[in-house]
Each structure stands twice: as C-alpha cells, then as structure tokens.
Amino acid sequence: MSDGLDVIVVDDDPGICEIITELIESFYTWGKVYSFSNPDKAIAFCLEREIGVAIFVIDVFLGGLSGFYFLDAIEQKYPTAHEDTIIISGNASDDVVNMCLASNVNYLLEKPLKPYALQLAVRAITAKYLEFAKKLLKDEQYAEDVARL
C-alpha cells in the first residue's frame, strides 16, 4: 500500500491497460499506479484498500460493464471517485459526454490517447490534493477543523 495518491487504471483490453499504466508511470511520482483489465477485480481491490482516495483512469466500456457502473460500485468508499476520474473512450459520442456530465466526471479523453492530454488531466486532479495538503500544513486551525470531520 502506498502512502501517496495512487492511480488506478481499468481497461478491459490488457494491452491498452499496460500502455496507459506505463505512460502514467513515466511521469507520475506522487503514488503508485495499479492496473486492472478485469473490472470486478478492480472493484474488489478498491473496496479492500484502507484509503478511499485515488485517481481513476477508466475505460467507458469494460466488457459487460460500464466505467460508470465501476464508479458507482466504489462511490461509498471513494466519495470523490467521479470527480477524480478520467474516462477514456474509443468514441466520445454525445451519450458518453452526457454520461460524464451527469456523473460529475470532468475529464474525457479519446483513444488513441495523447500522452500530454493524459498527463495534464492526471496533474489537474493531483493539484487539487496537493493544494489541500499545503493548506493543511500551513493552517493549523484548518487542519484541526478537518480532523474533526
């Protein structure tokens, strides 16, 4: 288990999953990168983790399941899962875009992925947590208030 902000990649195509994982590992230094080509195993892994925070890179279609089903399955443990997700799709149709909007997913990338687009999306989500951590370190009263939640 990592002490950082981990990235969890889920794509039912093992080759694509491996490529995305290697790409993220080439630039990401704030945690570990875990990858799954089986969404059920990914759900089980997420629910067994101690920490309910991660960045998710999820294919919109996961065999017989949807990426949105995956997010709904882990939402109780990961309350910010939807907003901390990058959905990837071979075809970002109007339906996929509307599902992202309805699910509060702000990042949608089309395959083939452009490495810089993925890096910027991961960085944007990471920045939210880095800013929060800085605020906790700088403001003792704020940190105490958060600890009481």
Language model features with spans:
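C-terminal output helix
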Residues: 113-122
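Alpha4 helix (beta4-alpha4-beta5 surface) of REC/receiver domains from two-component response regulators
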Residues: 69, 82, 92-107
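CheY-like receiver
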Residues: 127-149
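Acidic catalytic/metal-coordinating carboxylates
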Residues: 38, 66-69
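Two-component/phosphorelay signaling modules centered on CheY-like receiver
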Residues: 14-36
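Short amphipathic alpha-helix used as the core "switch/output" element in two-component signaling
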Residues: 44, 68-81
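Acidic, metal-coordinating helix/loop segments flanking the phosphotransfer/catalytic sites
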Residues: 35-55
